[in-house]
């Protein structure tokens, strides 16, 4: 026996200590709860001990007299002659002198608590008080009837017959031989009818729905019990009859509040707390509250037990140790065992609460399964994204097509193209097909508990992809998992690869195009310009324009089909916005401009060559002999050849129509050339800044400063050539040849080394001084060092002057 609620209304958490005496499983509804109410010192505890073989403390008149024995609420367990455990609440007696005027508060709380937790309430009433109001506790009974409405027990279906009604067992004590149960029953019912009419009137004014009679909400049993001291045998006989009726008809098979034995302590605690805190005591809500708590607790216990199994599954998936069948078998086993363990506990609680918690359990488990599948699909995604041979595949398709095209030259051609969308979708289809093979079979308990629809609502599409019914051999539900996160990553990777493939193909296309352009335009400057000194600039630009047009037509014909094939399914708008013809025209002119600009670095050589061809050769191409030539004629010839050769620098300042022979076909071609050539745009901007430039009406390909530098270099060499011609004309002979010993010295030491030393007289002198110092140091004759040093300086100066003059003279002659 344990005191659960003490004298000061504090709930002591010792219900579990009482339940330890029960040998049956704690997860059961197969028990009943009985409470007893009545006035103090009327034998309540004695009756309980006789009925249930309990050991509640009873009144000892000899030692303590008539006083309060039971304080608060005590709980005991009785199993004697009962098929299932009986939990008995021995409630402190009412109308006690010890509590005084505050007794009503505790009495009402105790009565309401007893009504909330009991299958059967025993009302212990002495026969002599049956016709009184206060002593018979009928005032308290009226409170109980009123409290029934606040408990909202009708929401559990009591008035509809779905759940057994609470039994009010009236134990009328100390009856005589003239009193019988029938007479006592009529009296009790008469009193109850009177009380019910009063309660119904007050509840009707509050708007509550009133049952027709108290019998709609309570079962009433009345037993007359003889006095134990006066009629021991009669007392025992009636007690045995009550016990028999309790076992066979009064007590239900299961606890009417649908709370398993293990959840009873929490239920009683929350009920008492609501009563003490003066909160609304809604019994269905309290039942749901306890059910929710215990079901969530059971769910957490299940998850704690299966976390290791789930983690092992995830590790095996990450290590590729599980195939499709192993994954399906393992997940089915986890679901079967976890749900079986869960419903073993939760099935005893409120169905709605147990279902909700089971859905929460399944959502967590499916989410962990999804993580395992995503981990595995991450590895598969990394395998699928290795596309190093895609570009080779594309090229091979082009080559195969070319072979087929050669065989069917007269038939309509079918060109292979790289379709980005088709390729990406094809690879994603492989991923989806693989993802759908990771399936989980639902155990039969999911169907029995009608959980398919809630699972679909909670898990699709975030966790599960779909739930399908398979009819192969047996009807089972199969779930596949949402792998959109990995699919999205793969799609992004594919898009990047696709773009890289196009970029590579475009790069190779333009590399091939530029290579052919350079190959075709390179001879233009040599053939038309360098080899023919008589060619005029207008003729040069006419021939060059004609060649560029022909090259353009040739390249368009060559690359047209490749262009169409490459960009047919491309989203690269920066390339497809302009047509092939305009693109080739743009690249042709740009590369030709670059070629001319590159020639500018050595263009003074071209000017000198043209000068030589005109100045040193006659009309028949025979070298001129300047000996005896008239000086005036030589000068006129020199001026003419020089002016003619320097005029070719105008090639760097052509007109727009000369530079762009295709401008008539492409109106905005010049603007694109300026846009794509930073050097050209900078030169144009620079020349516009010089208002006195002589080529403002032309397209400048080089700056004026570079042009002046070219003319200066060419003029120097032209002047040197003319000077040598004058020397020959005046002396009648060629410049002196190089001495033999100079050649020998060049062979032994090297021309570059000798030139470097000779162009540095100070270095030669320092070397000679160093040699004389070393000699003097070794011999100890430092006076000779000073003499030798002076002589070396004088001799080296003379020798260097002579050798330098000879070499420069010979080199000038070779030029």
UniProtKB/Swiss-Prot annotation:
The chain crosses the membrane at residues 738-758, 762-782. GO terms for cellular component: endoplasmic reticulum membrane. SUPFAM superfamilies: P-loop containing nucleoside triphosphate hydrolases (SSF52540). Residues 759-761 are lumenal. Pfam families: RHD3_GTPase, Sey1_3HB. The keyword Oxidoreductase does not apply. Gene3D superfamilies: P-loop containing nucleotide triphosphate hydrolases. It is found in: Endoplasmic reticulum membrane. InterPro entries: G_GB1_RHD3_dom, P-loop_NTPase, RHD3/Sey1, Sey1/RHD3-like_3HB. Its EC number is 3.6.5.-. One of its GO terms (molecular function) is GTPase activity. Keywords: Coiled coil, Endoplasmic reticulum, GTP-binding, Hydrolase, Membrane, Nucleotide-binding, Transmembrane, Transmembrane helix. Residues 1-737, 783-815 are cytoplasmic. Residues 298-321 form a coiled coil. The keyword Lyase does not apply. One of its GO terms (biological process) is endoplasmic reticulum membrane fusion. It comes from the Eukaryota. GTP binds at residues 38-45. Residues 28-260 form the GB1/RHD3-type G domain. HAMAP family: Sey1 (MF_03109). Probable GTP-binding protein that may be involved in cell development. Belongs to the TRAFAC class dynamin-like GTPase superfamily. GB1/RHD3 GTPase family. RHD3 subfamily. This is Protein SEY1 homolog.
